[in-house]
């Protein structure tokens, strides 16, 4: 299953369902060229995530870190960290995602398993992410298990839920056996940059349909305009203005696909001052006009 455009709330938290309460895991393959902007923009979720590149080359950004992954390599992204994925090649770039809530492997609330082997790792500010490579035995083992999980999830043979559970437990054991953290120095808090970015994202998502001033954004995190721009560009790898454009374009997609509103109405509804400017930016970002996109995606 492809998740084309990730739904996020005003705090940049992803609102896509990652499985169900009884079985809190979702496995899917992302084809970046099928996303309207050609990449997966910044978001975060409570679930931990394993990714395995199945085609092409992909840049993964996690907080201030950037990883370039080739086909066959993977990445672990911890709970609650902002992340983004961009293709490096013009042709098909894809990766398998495994998202699961760690309650799934925690036995029960208050258990030794949860207290000793799960919570210290997902709450740690020492582990935001790490790359999985084929030439490291324990990492290669996790990559094999990602492939196995993908197969189990879609074949759905007898006992597949149980087999998925066992495989996840084994993957988690690989991690805690090889990634060492100083539990005495463990801090639950994320970096100040991470928290400030979430405040900026929240402000943009609450106000994208209106005119947004840089001064207002800077005031939300108590920095001057220059410091605010520098922080954003350093971490998000684009300007605040560019991000706002991308967010407005993404928000307009639902209107194009699911309403009969005119292009002008959609432009104004999503914060563009004129329909011509909306069409110009839309074509620049997607290589097609809003009308062409609507015709291709009529329900």
Locations of regions flagged by a protein language model:
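Regular secondary-structure segments
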Residues: 54, 126, 143-154, 201, ...
């Amino acid at each position: 299953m492809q998740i084309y455009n990730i739904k996020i709330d005003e705090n940049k938290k992803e609102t896509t369902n990652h499985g169900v309460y009884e079985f809190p895991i979702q496995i899917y393959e992302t084809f970046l060229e099928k996303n309207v902007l050609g990449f997966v923009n910044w978001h975060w979720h409570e679930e931990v995530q394993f990714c395995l590149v199945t085609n092409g080359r992909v840049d993964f950004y996690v907080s201030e870190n950037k990883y370039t992954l080739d086909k066959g390599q993977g990445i672990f992204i911890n709970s609650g960290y902002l992340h983004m994925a961009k293709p490096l090649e013009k042709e098909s770039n894809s990766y398998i995602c495994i998202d699961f809530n760690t309650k799934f492997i925690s036995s029960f609330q208050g258990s030794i398993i949860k207290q000793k082997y799960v919570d210290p790792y997902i709450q740690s500010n020492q582990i935001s992410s790490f790359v999985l490579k084929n030439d490291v035995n324990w990492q290669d083992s996790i990559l094999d298990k990602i492939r196995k999980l993908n197969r189990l999830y879609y074949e759905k043979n007898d006992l597949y839920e149980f087999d998925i559970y066992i495989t996840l437990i084994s993957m988690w054991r690989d991690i805690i056996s090889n990634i060492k953290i100083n539990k005495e120095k463990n801090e639950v808090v994320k970096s100040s940059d991470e928290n400030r970015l979430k405040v900026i994202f929240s402000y943009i998502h609450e106000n994208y349909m209106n005119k947004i001033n840089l001064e207002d954004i800077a005031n939300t995190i108590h920095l001057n305009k220059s410091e605010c721009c520098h922080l954003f560009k350093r971490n998000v790898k684009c300007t605040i203005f560019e991000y706002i454009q991308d967010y407005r374009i993404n928000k307009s997609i639902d209107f194009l696909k699911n309403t009969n509103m005119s292009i002008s109405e959609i432009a104004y509804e999503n914060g563009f001052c004129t329909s011509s400017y909306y069409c110009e930016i839309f074509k620049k970002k997607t290589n097609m006009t809003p009308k062409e996109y609507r015709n291709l995606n009529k329900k």
